[in-house]
Design a protein with these regions (language model features):
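A conserved amphipathic helix/loop scaffold
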Residues: 83, 215-382
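Glycan-processing catalytic domains of CAZymes
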Residues: 1-236, 244-255, 259-268, 324, ...
Length: 382
């Protein structure tokens, strides 16, 4: 392609296995750019993260008569301007953290002729995009001193993603966590279990492991490694934080289902504890974390492993969110995570608490419905 004076772009959606933008081989191919169609913030971070000269976002809604779910878009009854603004809100918070070079639309351009409100909405979005792009050009946004590592089997290879769009993978708590993290003022990277064994935790403050027992996101048999458990235990004991969501570190065949139960202060009963009692507890409300109960799950077989574990939320007498001091660090557990503005704020406050930082840290809004980004070079709060 280059031999004929053309450029080669990857459209990252239709066929990508073996050509993951975060893979070691991607750069060697020599692509000139990456195009990613986006509904969500995590997809923007995925695109911007790739090492190519040009990053382009393809916005929704596509210029088609109907949308993916069959509802009218650019046809009678459609309100594409509302769709565009709704998706832009998710995209914008991620772009404030990491920029791309271009934005665009796909489909049949003539369909927009009868939808002037859509054209006006896109003009406004384009103006906002140019402003954000210029802010990044002048200098990077302020980031809190919080370094987060999302831990799963794939590590860096599947940075920011699971396999597809949000609506295709939204049964997994991790995609909700990725979406929340996409717009937060924290440093985020993705590591594998082998990375942990090779010293990856030396540049990390918080590790997040979220998934169901046996899946690649929780880790499955990777947790049979005593070296892995020992390294994470040391990390927390010396001052780090381990946040587990769903069935983190879960694998059968040991005295506890969660291999990190001693750090988390909570475990899940697989039916083998019928003759054991339960620690009594009261829900505590004095920690600086605003719990969003509706975003948490309702796992029925959770129990405390330690009477010193603080329960922040319980349903039907079962703990669903807990905090456990372990050495100089903390183990924090959530039974699930469903992204919304309130739960995103809950995650941010959890990260702040895990790192012993105040919830009223600089350049943060005290309103869960308002997110901010501060650009020191311009002395501008967006």
């Amino acid at each position: 392609i280059h031999k004929h004076g053309k450029q080669a772009y990857v459209f990252y959606d239709d066929s990508w296995v073996g050509m993951e933008p975060c893979g070691e081989r991607f750069q060697s191919v020599g692509f000139d750019g990456l195009i990613k169609c986006v509904f969500s913030g995590f997809e923007c971070r995925l695109c911007a993260y790739a090492k190519v000269p040009v990053h382009e976002l393809r916005f929704h809604p596509y210029l088609f008569p109907v949308g993916l779910n069959g509802t009218p878009t650019f046809s009678e009854g459609g309100t594409p301007e509302k769709d565009a603004v709704r998706y832009w809100r998710s995209v914008r918070r991620a772009l404030l953290r990491q920029p791309v070079e271009r934005i665009g639309l796909g489909g049949y351009l003539h369909l927009t002729q009868n939808f002037p409100a859509f054209n006006d909405a896109i003009a406004d979005i384009a103006d906002e995009f140019r402003t954000i792009k210029q802010l990044h050009k002048n200098g990077a946004p302020y980031v809190l001193p919080i370094r987060v590592a999302v831990l799963h089997t794939w590590g860096k290879l599947r940075s920011w993603t699971l396999s597809g769009h949000f609506h295709e993978t939204n049964k997994h708590a991790l995609i909700h966590i990725n979406e929340a993290l996409a717009g937060l003022p924290v440093d985020v990277k993705f590591i594998s279990f082998e990375d942990v064994k090779n010293g990856a935790l030396k540049d990390v403050d918080v590790v997040i492991n979220a998934g169901r027992m046996g899946d690649a996101w929780s880790g499955g048999k990777a947790w049979e490694s005593e070296e892995l458990v020992s390294e994470l235990t040391r990390f927390v004991y010396e001052g780090g934080a381990f946040i587990g969501v769903g069935e983190p570190s879960a694998t059968p065949g040991y005295d506890r289902l969660f291999r990190m139960a001693h750090v988390l202060g909570v475990d899940e009963d697989d039916g083998s504890r019928v003759c054991h009692g339960r620690w009594a507890f009261e829900v505590e409300h004095d920690l600086p974390i605003t719990v969003e109960e509706s975003s948490l799950g309702n796992l029925p077989h959770l129990y405390l492993t330690d009477g010193d574990t603080h329960v922040l939320c319980a349903k039907n007498g079962v703990p669903q969110m807990t905090v456990h001091d372990f050495g100089k660090g903390k183990g924090i557990y959530m039974s699930h995570f469903h992204v919304n503005p309130a739960s995103t704020r809950m995650l941010l406050e959890t990260l702040l608490y895990a790192c012993n930082l105040p919830v009223n840290s600089a350049w943060l809004s005290d309103n869960a419905l308002v997110e901010t980004a501060y650009y020191p070079a311009d002395r501008r709060l967006v």
